[in-house]
């Protein structure tokens, strides 16, 4: 089709490696900025009622989110300046620091407890969530480990025990908060990288079965988790109890229909939908911008994930395994977290405290996610330099 051919040509022109755009992936950077701006707009609208009630300022959270967006852009820029070899050298220190933070947050008087969960460390501008840093640290550690043990992981049956044991250590501290959602994200990152590495088939199947059984046990062993897990099956059975969040989220999507009620016209955000600007921000987006608004965000995030996976594939083709595994780990992380958040809001999955990447309100989530974008830009930059160097050698 001529139209699709034209779109494809425009995309190839935009992302082609030429001296004028050698330094960065323009498509990835544009997607990053657009999602940040959409997130700022969504949070500004969704947080008006709660900002008015708590601080007598309807734009209290919007102002703070604008600060987080600025800090995220600065963080992304700083990460682009750091060579990937430094991250590979720091993988053990990053992992150890993440464990330290996960222990620190559990100490009474240091960790901030909200709704029975101790997940945050109070800081000047925001409450830092160590779980977000743990995801980045584990991804970096696994990328380095699988680079060094590549042949061993592909051939030996028990070679994945060490990375899963270390992931389990992080998971143990996360479950103590409790934070099952972040624990599952760590498992998905680990499992996804094992798939990319090409781990032994039976080892792969065994770990998947073990992870599934462990998840079932964790759900069944806690009455609170079991209620949340079963509540999504029929949220209207107990609309003022376990199904309160989900029933209001579904009503928000229902009111939005195809094109939404318009910016600022959400009814469910008026104290009916808890966490409207954080975990359930997509429900407010669905109510105000409808199915088409949700579709646009999903497409944008999908394109960002596609770029991340393409960068990972290019790294592996250039035999840069650490960069490739790091990029793939980031793509699995972003995909799964976005999938779970949207699925949770739509009632397809149990409610979990996972933010939607680059959209939901939260300083820790935005800044750490922006670090991953900076890392992807750096990996792509180094890949481009390497390919240009190889091309010049062939020409000579």
From Swiss-Prot:
It comes from the Bacteria. GO terms for biological process: cell wall organization; FtsZ-dependent cytokinesis; peptidoglycan biosynthetic process; regulation of cell shape. Coiled coil: none annotated. It is an enzyme of class 2 (transferase). It is found in: Cell inner membrane. Its EC number is 2.4.99.28. Residues 1-27, 86-93, 144-157, 307-323, 377-396 are cytoplasmic. It catalyses: [GlcNAc-(1->4)-Mur2Ac(oyl-L-Ala-gamma-D-Glu-L-Lys-D-Ala-D-Ala)](n)-di-trans,octa-cis-undecaprenyl diphosphate + beta-D-GlcNAc-(1->4)-Mur2Ac(oyl-L-Ala-gamma-D-Glu-L-Lys-D-Ala-D-Ala)-di-trans,octa-cis-undecaprenyl diphosphate = [GlcNAc-(1->4)-Mur2Ac(oyl-L-Ala-gamma-D-Glu-L-Lys-D-Ala-D-Ala)](n+1)-di-trans,octa-cis-undecaprenyl diphosphate + di-trans,octa-cis-undecaprenyl diphosphate + H(+). Pathway: Cell wall biogenesis; peptidoglycan biosynthesis. Residues 49-64, 115-122, 179-183, 226-285, 345-355 are periplasmic. This is Probable peptidoglycan glycosyltransferase FtsW. It comes from Pasteurella multocida (strain Pm70). The gene is ftsW.
């Amino acid at each position: 089709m001529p139209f699709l051919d034209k779109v494809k040509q425009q995309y190839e022109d935009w992302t082609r490696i030429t001296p004028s755009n050698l330094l960065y992936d323009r498509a990835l950077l544009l997607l990053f900025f657009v999602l940040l701006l959409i997130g700022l707009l969504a949070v500004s609208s969704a947080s008006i009622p709660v900002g008015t009630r708590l601080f007598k300022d309807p734009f209290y959270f919007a102002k703070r989110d604008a600060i987080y967006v600025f800090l995220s852009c600065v963080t992304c820029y700083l990460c682009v300046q750091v060579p990937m070899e430094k991250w590979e050298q720091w993988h053990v220190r990053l992992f150890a620091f993440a464990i330290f933070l996960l222990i620190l947050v559990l100490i009474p008087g240091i960790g901030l407890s909200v709704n029975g969960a101790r997940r945050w460390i109070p800081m000047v501008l925001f409450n830092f969530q160590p779980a977000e840093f743990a995801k980045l640290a584990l991804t970096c550690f696994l990328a380095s480990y699988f680079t060094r043990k590549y042949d061993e992981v592909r051939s030996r049956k028990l070679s994945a025990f060490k990375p899963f044991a270390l992931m389990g250590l992080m998971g143990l501290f996360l479950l103590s908060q409790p934070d099952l959602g972040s624990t599952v994200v760590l498992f998905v990152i680990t499992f996804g990288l094992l798939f990319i590495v090409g781990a032994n088939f039976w080892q792969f199947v065994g770990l998947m079965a073990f992870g599934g059984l462990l998840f079932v046990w964790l759900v069944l062993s806690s009455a609170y988790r079991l209620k949340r897990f079963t509540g999504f099956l029929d949220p209207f059975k107990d609309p003022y109890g376990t199904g309160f969040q989900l029933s209001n989220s579904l009503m928000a999507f229902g009111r939005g229909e195809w094109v939404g009620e318009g910016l600022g016209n959400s009814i469910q955000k008026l104290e009916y939908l808890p966490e409207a600007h954080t975990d359930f921000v997509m429900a407010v987006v669905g109510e105000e911008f409808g199915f088409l608004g949700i579709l646009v965000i999903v497409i944008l995030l999908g394109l960002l994930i596609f770029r991340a996976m393409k960068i990972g594939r290019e790294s592996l083709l250039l035999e840069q395994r650490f960069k490739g595994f790091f990029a793939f780990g980031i793509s699995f992380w972003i995909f799964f977290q976005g999938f779970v958040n949207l699925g949770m809001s739509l009632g397809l999955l149990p409610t979990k405290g996972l933010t939607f990447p680059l959209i939901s309100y939260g300083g820790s989530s935005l800044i750490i996610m922006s670090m991953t974008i900076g890392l992807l830009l750096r990996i792509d930059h180094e890949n481009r330099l390497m390919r240009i160097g190889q091309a010049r050698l062939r020409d000579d």
